[in-house]
């Protein structure tokens, strides 16, 4: 069977899968989920169709940032075993195609958001894309050990965008959601970077773990403590305060336990401790935002 003017079907499907991988779909799912929590927590109502369009625009914006990140970092991705099978270093998509895809989705997502939702949400979406693709990827990532801290701002935008899709303006509540993701990001990524620090060093990426294992552990513990505290604050604004505080305290205690176990290890960080924290942090973010949505 032949599709698309003589292009074989298996090739067309392969290309579609490659472009999908270019958009970093796992990050996209998380972004849409946290943005949806912002919409649910926000006071007032939003037309279901407008809410759907907003979520799709946020997903497109996330994919656009992912594509631009892979375009710029293709040289690094080719060196690291964790990323060398990505579409560009494996030769399945060219750098030019990735750039075109990223730019097109960036413009389209912001334009549709401004046209159908509101200008504030569109501006925040544009800032999120620019912060990840330009400030983090092009400026910070190869220059400072604090790259993931400052770069985490980009990933913290979605719940604020979701909130403003409903209200038209950010608020303290939406900024608390922002801070949860901002404080969650460093422990999440640093836990994994402890296992991959040799590859980061080879690729020339100045991750904190490349400079000091102990400092990385200390930073992870510090951010985990701050996350524990800040994650309790949405309880001041949700309808089911007691239930939320019980959930947030329980999740935070497990997170801190993983961080403490990693901190107290002597010598080389073990895969068990690093992956234990990294894996639980994914569940933590999903569960804490689920709790916020359910208790609102």
From Swiss-Prot:
Subcellular location: Cell inner membrane
MF-aspect GO terms: protoheme IX farnesyltransferase activity
Catalyzed chemical reaction(s): heme b + (2E,6E)-farnesyl diphosphate + H2O = Fe(II)-heme o + diphosphate
Principal localisation: membrane
Function: Converts heme B (protoheme IX) to heme O by substitution of the vinyl group on carbon 2 of heme B porphyrin ring with a hydroxyethyl farnesyl side group.
Name by which UniProt lists this protein: Protoheme IX farnesyltransferase
EC number: 2.5.1.141
Entry-linked InterPro entries: Protohaem_IX_farnesylTrfase (IPR006369), UbiA_prenyltransferase (IPR000537), UbiA_prenylTrfase_CS (IPR030470), UbiA_sf (IPR044878)
Topology versus the membrane: Multi-pass membrane protein
PROSITE patterns per record: UBIA (PS00943)
A Pfam cross-reference name: UbiA
Other notes: Carbon 2 of the heme B porphyrin ring is defined according to the Fischer nomenclature.
Superkingdom of the organism of origin: Bacteria
Organism annotation: Anaplasma phagocytophilum (strain HZ)
GO-annotated biological processes: heme O biosynthetic process
Transmembrane segments: 27-47, 48-68, 98-118, 120-140, 148-168, 175-195, 219-239, 242-262, 274-294
Record family assignment: Belongs to the UbiA prenyltransferase family. Protoheme IX farnesyltransferase subfamily.
Keyword Amino-acid biosynthesis included in the entry's annotation: no
A GO cellular-component term linked to this record: plasma membrane
Biological or metabolic pathway of the protein: Porphyrin-containing compound metabolism; heme O biosynthesis; heme O from protoheme: step 1/1
Class in the EC hierarchy, top level: transferase
Keywords: Cell inner membrane, Cell membrane, Heme biosynthesis, Membrane, Transferase, Transmembrane, Transmembrane helix
């Amino acid at each position: 069977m032949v599709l698309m003017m003589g292009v074989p079907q298996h090739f067309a499907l392969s290309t579609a899968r490659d472009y999908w991988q270019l958009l970093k779909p796992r990050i996209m799912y998380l972004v849409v989920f946290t943005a949806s929590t912002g919409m649910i927590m926000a006071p007032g109502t939003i037309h279901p169709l407008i809410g759907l369009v907003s979520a799709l625009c946020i997903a497109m914006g996330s994919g656009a940032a992912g594509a631009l990140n892979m375009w710029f970092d293709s040289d690094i991705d080719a060196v690291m075993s964790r990323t060398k099978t990505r579409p560009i270093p494996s030769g399945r998509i060219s750098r030019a195609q990735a750039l075109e895809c990223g730019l097109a989705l960036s413009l389209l997502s912001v334009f549709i958001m401004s046209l159908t939702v509101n200008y504030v949400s569109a501006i925040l979406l544009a800032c999120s894309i620019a912060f990840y693709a330009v400030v983090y990827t092009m400026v910070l990532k190869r220059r400072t050990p604090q790259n993931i801290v400052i770069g985490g701002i980009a990933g913290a935008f979605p719940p604020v965008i979701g909130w403003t899709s409903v209200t038209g303006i950010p608020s303290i509540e939406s900024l608390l959601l922002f801070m949860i993701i901002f404080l969650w990001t460093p422990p999440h990524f640093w836990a994994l970077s402890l296992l991959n620090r040799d590859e980061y060093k080879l690729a020339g990426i100045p991750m904190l773990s490349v400079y000091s294992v102990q400092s990385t552990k200390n930073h992870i513990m510090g951010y985990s403590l701050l996350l524990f505290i800040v994650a309790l604050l949405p309880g001041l604004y949700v309808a089911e305060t007691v239930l939320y505080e019980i959930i947030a305290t329980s999740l935070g205690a497990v997170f801190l336990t993983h961080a403490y176990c990693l901190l107290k290890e002597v010598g080389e960080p073990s895969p068990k401790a690093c992956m234990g924290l990294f894996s639980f942090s994914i569940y933590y973010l999903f569960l804490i935002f689920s709790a916020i949505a359910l208790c609102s």
